[in-house]
Amino acid sequence: MVFFDPVYRQIQFENDEDGKPAGKYPDVIHGISVTEDNSIEVNLFAPDAKSVSVVLENGTEELLYRSKKNDGYWEKTIGNPAEGFNYVTFMVNGTPVVNPAAPVGFGYNRAVNFAEVPERNFSWHELKKTDHGQIHIHYSCDGDGQVSMNYVYTPAGYGEDNCDTGRVCVLECAADERNFCWIHQGKIANIMDNLSGEGRIKGIMIIMADSTISDDIIGNITAIYGIKDSAQKEWFKKGDNESWTSCRHRFVNFMCGIQ
């Protein structure tokens, strides 16, 4: 499951003196945190482990050390990580695991932790004060009876005041990822909101798809919005070995280029 809430705040169920529920949210040690100098601090609770390491997206493996301050924890500070989105795979005794106290994304056909390191010269993917569009979920059934779920982004005011231009862009994710990655890891909604807010683009609907989406499903989705099958569609595909950081940059250039 992909989630982006503060995972370090986990509820602790307790009762007060009268026996009434009095749950609280104690802070636990962050599994992944980014420091002011953009280093990555990693922590994992694994008291019985013989070895713990993390493998970064560039393939570098960093060994963690037993914490002298926190019993059962392994820790390390990693300097000079790549800016942007970074997959971080925790390894315990040589086996990949998911750290429940760190953000979780999806890649390599499995759940995987990640770190988001601020970029100095790129902020289109960040949440900003601007008009925000909407994300819709559409369920479709193909000829084989398989039900699929696809995500659609429409900009603020879509369908009003001539904002609807009838233009569509289909995003196709990498083979080892899923269409929801466009929202959580690609930050497509934020990028589109910010580009629209600055007048760089206007009235483009985005369909976020897996690599197996069919033309029939695309047609069914666009028909809901009154868009004809003959309407021109732009296609943008994430490379199988492309980082999400690179994909975000390329997507911004792509969208500005088709205006």
Label each region the model flagged.
Residues 3-22, 27-28, 34-53, 57-61, ...:
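Non-catalytic cap/lid and distal C-terminal segments of serine-dependent acyl enzymes
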